[in-house]
């Protein structure tokens, strides 16, 4: 497509989405749930075909020299597809919050005032790699009564098109508008520039991907943006703590999967437990091939661990999202220094403390400036599915409108409802 055709194409998508949004907003819960259950069924029925489409994307990615952690994000394994199907079913089983009125109160004037939860309208989703985001975004759009326009990465175009066809089929089966969920079919980047500059059609943009994508969208968008930025997450091992538990959690937070944004990239260890904890976690990481980039104090302890891969951490390491079997390690004086380090170098995504001290736990929860803060749990739990939200559309590192995993509620807003019996203002 040339520039003119792309502009016409994206405006057509926008107009179609805006038109469909009215019907999506009015759809009864039973109809929306019917579409979600149909989508879950279609995903399970088409696993082999979807993996065939996905294989073409994987082949192109490897031929283009894409790093293996990025290739991993492209994979539509049977497990990934089953998780998507379960997410659709979980959403269908959840109460429909659209139209709920909350906080209704009688005022001295006689009127009653409350707020009704309503869909945002139309959201645009721009994302890289993970094709399962197509299903997560589509299913949340359906449940929340919104229309959406999805623009996935060029590296996953075949997978995204195949998934979008199943979404369209599910919408049709339920009697919902075919344009309720639309995928941008071109890989031309000019389409992104058009999509983020159509406030007459699109109410909010949700970018999900690398820092470059997020910064570009934030700078150029002419509509509000809900950002899903870096995942430089930390696990802090406190003094006192349960060492056995701390080793298990720190292991899971880093190695359960390297590519997600909620994997821990930094390990902070209180000086009082460092000599006991670091050799044990070092042995675990050594067995799994994880490189530990440490401060001098951490390295002095870790050098005694057989087979461990060590490097001296640089200033850049404290801010790095590795998405790989690498973790930064720093010994700190205690909870105060850990919190200061996280707030300075972290990405305000998810951070955890492993501790037996209730006051330290409360201080950490209060003072760490992140979307999710955890006590004695793996950062890998920072996920809409694990939080009981069904699917998630992303994990917002913003502070306004939505923060943390963005589920149904994050795709809605509140409007004021006033009920009277002829009252007039005096």
Swiss-Prot record:
<dbReference type="InterPro" id="IPR015590">
    <property type="entry name" value="Aldehyde_DH_dom"/>
</dbReference>
<dbReference type="Pfam" id="PF00171">
    <property type="entry name" value="Aldedh"/>
</dbReference>
<comment type="function">
    <text>Catalyzes the NADPH-dependent reduction of L-glutamate 5-phosphate into L-glutamate 5-semialdehyde and phosphate. The product spontaneously undergoes cyclization to form 1-pyrroline-5-carboxylate.</text>
</comment>
<keyword id="KW-0963">Cytoplasm</keyword>
<dbReference type="InterPro" id="IPR016163">
    <property type="entry name" value="Ald_DH_C"/>
</dbReference>
<keyword id="KW-0560">Oxidoreductase</keyword>
<dbReference type="InterPro" id="IPR012134">
    <property type="entry name" value="Glu-5-SA_DH"/>
</dbReference>
<dbReference type="GO" id="GO:0050661">
    <property type="term" value="F:NADP binding"/>
</dbReference>
<comment type="pathway">
    <text>Amino-acid biosynthesis; L-proline biosynthesis; L-glutamate 5-semialdehyde from L-glutamate: step 2/2.</text>
</comment>
<keyword id="KW-0028">Amino-acid biosynthesis</keyword>
<keyword id="KW-0521">NADP</keyword>
<dbReference type="InterPro" id="IPR020593">
    <property type="entry name" value="G-glutamylP_reductase_CS"/>
</dbReference>
<dbReference type="GO" id="GO:0005737">
    <property type="term" value="C:cytoplasm"/>
</dbReference>
<dbReference type="InterPro" id="IPR016162">
    <property type="entry name" value="Ald_DH_N"/>
</dbReference>
<keyword id="KW-0641">Proline biosynthesis</keyword>
<dbReference type="GO" id="GO:0055129">
    <property type="term" value="P:L-proline biosynthetic process"/>
</dbReference>
<dbReference type="GO" id="GO:0004350">
    <property type="term" value="F:glutamate-5-semialdehyde dehydrogenase activity"/>
</dbReference>
<dbReference type="InterPro" id="IPR016161">
    <property type="entry name" value="Ald_DH/histidinol_DH"/>
</dbReference>
<comment type="similarity">
    <text>Belongs to the gamma-glutamyl phosphate reductase family.</text>
</comment>
<protein>
    <recommendedName>
        <fullName>Gamma-glutamyl phosphate reductase</fullName>
        <ecNumber>1.2.1.41</ecNumber>
    </recommendedName>
</protein>
<dbReference type="InterPro" id="IPR000965">
    <property type="entry name" value="GPR_dom"/>
</dbReference>
């Amino acid at each position: 497509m040339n520039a003119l055709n792309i502009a016409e194409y994206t405006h057509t998508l926008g107009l179609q989405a805006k038109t469909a949004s009215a019907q999506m907003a009015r759809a009864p819960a039973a109809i929306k749930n019917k579409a979600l259950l149909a989508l879950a069924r279609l995903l399970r029925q088409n696993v082999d075909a979807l993996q065939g489409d996905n294989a073409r994307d994987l082949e192109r990615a490897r031929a283009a020299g894409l790093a293996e952690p990025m290739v991993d994000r492209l994979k539509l394994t049977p497990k990934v597809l089953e998780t998507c199907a379960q997410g659709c079913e979980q959403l269908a089983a959840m109460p429909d919050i659209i139209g709920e009125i909350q906080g209704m109160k009688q005022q001295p004037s006689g009127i009653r005032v409350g707020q009704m939860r309503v869909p945002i309208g139309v959201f645009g989703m721009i994302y890289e790699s993970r094709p399962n985001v197509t299903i997560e975004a589509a299913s949340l759009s359906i449940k929340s009564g919104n229309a959406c326009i999805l623009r996935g990465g060029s590296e996953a175009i075949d997978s995204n098109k195949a998934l979008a066809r199943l979404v369209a089929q599910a919408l049709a089966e339920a009697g919902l508008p075919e344009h309720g969920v639309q995928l941008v079919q071109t890989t031309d980047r000019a389409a992104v520039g058009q999509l983020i500059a159509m406030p007459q059609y699109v109410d909010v943009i949700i970018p999900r991907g690398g820092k470059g994508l997020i910064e570009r969208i934030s700078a150029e968008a002419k509509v509000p943006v809900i950002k899903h930025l870096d995942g430089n997450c930390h696990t802090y091992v406190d003094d006192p703590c349960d060492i056995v538990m701390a080793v298990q959690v720190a292991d899971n937070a880093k190695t359960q999967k390297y590519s997600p944004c909620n994997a821990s990239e930094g390990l902070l260890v209180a000086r009082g437990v460092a000599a006991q904890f670091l050799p044990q976690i070092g042995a675990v990481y050594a067995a799994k091939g994880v490189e530990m980039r440490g401060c001098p104090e951490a390295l002095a302890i870790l050098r005694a661990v057989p087979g461990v891969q060590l490097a001296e951490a640089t200033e850049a390491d404290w801010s790095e999202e590795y998405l790989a079997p690498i973790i930064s390690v720093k010994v700190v004086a205690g909870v105060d220094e850990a919190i200061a380090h996280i707030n300075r170098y972290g990405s305000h995504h998810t951070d955890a403390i492993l501790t037996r001290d209730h006051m330290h736990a409360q201080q950490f929860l209060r003072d760490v400036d992140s979307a999710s803060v955890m006590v004695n749990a793996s950062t890998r739990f920072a996920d809409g599915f694990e939080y009981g939200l069904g699917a998630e559309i992303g994990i917002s590192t913003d502070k306004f409108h939505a923060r943390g995993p963005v589920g149904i509620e994050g795709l809605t807003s509140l409007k004021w409802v006033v009920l009277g019996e002829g009252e007039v203002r005096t």
